[in-house]
Regions:
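Aromatic-residue detector
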Residues: 104, 129-133, 232
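Short, flexible coil/linker elements and helix-boundary hinge sites characteristic
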Residues: 26, 108, 142-143
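Extended assembly-interface regions of large multimeric machines
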Residues: 83-115
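C-terminal assembly and membrane-engagement modules of membrane-active proteins
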Residues: 1-84, 89-90, 97-98, 158-260
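Residues that form generic nucleotide/phosphate-binding pockets
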Residues: 103, 138, 242, 246
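A broad structural signal for short, well-ordered beta-strand segments within beta-sheet-rich domains
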Residues: 111, 122, 191-194
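Membrane-inserting effector segments that mediate pore formation, membrane fusion
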Residues: 117-169
Length: 260
C-alpha cells in the first residue's frame, strides 16, 4: 500500500474535505441527564457505545480504542439526527445505516464486506442475544468470537437496576423497534479491523428491552446486517482532534465500560 499519510498533498486534501464534512454534521441535542465515565470505557476490554456493544483485542492500545469509540459514536449520532424516530419509535433502518457508513468513510474507515438481509427465525420464539451471536459467528473465529460472547454475558450479568443496563436499554429500544450491534476490534498489519453484526427488530407491541427476553416470531420483522471495516490510525490522526471537538461532552452520555 502506498504511504499516502506521508504525502503532504493527500494530507492537506483529506484534512480540508473532512474538516468541512465534520463541521457540517448535525448531531442530536446534548442530553446532560445521562452521564458515564468515558475513561472507564477506554480502559475496558468491552463497552457500551450508544447502541453498539464493542470489544477490543488485548493488543489494541488506549489511543486505538479511543479512535474506534469516538469515530463510531460520531457516525451513530449523525445517523440518529438524519433519520429520527417517529411517534412509534420507528425510523428508516437502511437510511440510518447508509448515513452511518457515509460518516465512517469520511473519517477514514474503509468497508471490506457488507451485507443486509431479512433474518428468518425457525421456531415460535427467539431471543435477540442468541440471534446476534449466531449472525456474528460467521465473521469471527477463536478468541474474537469468545470476546463477543463474553461481552453479551457481561451485559446479561448486570443487575436490573444497574445504570449501564439502563443506558443500553435507553439507546437500543424505542417502543416498537430495537436496534443493536455487536462487534470486535482487532489489529492486523498495522490497521484496526472492526467486524460487527447488527440486528433490527420491528414489532407491533411496545417493549423496553431487546436482549434476553423471548419474542414471538408471529409479532415481528427482523433484519440483520454484517460488515468488516478497517481504519488506518495514521489517516485517522488527521481528523482525530476535530472528531473529539465535535463530540465534546456527548461522549460521557453514551459510553460505559463492561467487565469481561
Amino acid at each position: 500500500m502506498p504511504d499516502f499519510v506521508s504525502d503532504s498533498i493527500f494530507k492537506d486534501a483529506f484534512l480540508r474535505a473532512s474538516r468541512h464534512y465534520i463541521e457540517a454534521l448535525d448531531l442530536p441535542a446534548f442530553d446532560s441527564r445521562r452521564s458515564s465515565d468515558a475513561k472507564e470505557a477506554i480502559d475496558s476490554a468491552a463497552c457500551i457505545n450508544n447502541r453498539m456493544l464493542q470489544s477490543f483485542a488485548a493488543d489494541l492500545n488506549e489511543q486505538q480504542k479511543s479512535d474506534v469509540l469516538n469515530s463510531t459514536l460520531l457516525a451513530q449520532l449523525a445517523a440518529d439526527k438524519a433519520y429520527p424516530k417517529d411517534e412509534h419509535g420507528r425510523y428508516d433502518v437502511k437510511g440510518w445505516y447508509n448515513k452511518f457508513s457515509e460518516v465512517l468513510l469520511n473519517l477514514g474507515w474503509v468497508s471490506q464486506n457488507t451485507a443486509f438481509w431479512q433474518y428468518k427465525i425457525h421456531g415460535k420464539s427467539f431471543t435477540a442475544d442468541k440471534a446476534i451471536l449466531e449472525i456474528i459467528n460467521g465473521l469471527l473465529q477463536n478468541n474474537a468470537l469468545l470476546l463477543a460472547q463474553a461481552t453479551i454475558n457481561a451485559l446479561k450479568n448486570l443487575p436490573e437496576n444497574d445504570s449501564k443496563l439502563t443506558l443500553f436499554k435507553f439507546n437500543t429500544c424505542s417502543d416498537q423497534m430495537g436496534n443493536i450491534s455487536l462487534g470486535v476490534c482487532t489489529q492486523k498489519n498495522g490497521l484496526i479491523e472492526y467486524d460487527f453484526a447488527a440486528l433490527y427488530l420491528e414489532t407491533k407491541k411496545n417493549f423496553k428491552q431487546i436482549l434476553f427476553i423471548d419474542f414471538s416470531t408471529s409479532d415481528f420483522k427482523l433484519f440483520a446486517g454484517t460488515n468488516t471495516i478497517t481504519l488506518n490510525p495514521d489517516v485517522y490522526s488527521i481528523v482525530r482532534d476535530q472528531v473529539a471537538q465535535k463530540l465534546h461532552d456527548r461522549v460521557g452520555s453514551y459510553l460505559a465500560g463492561l467487565d469481561i
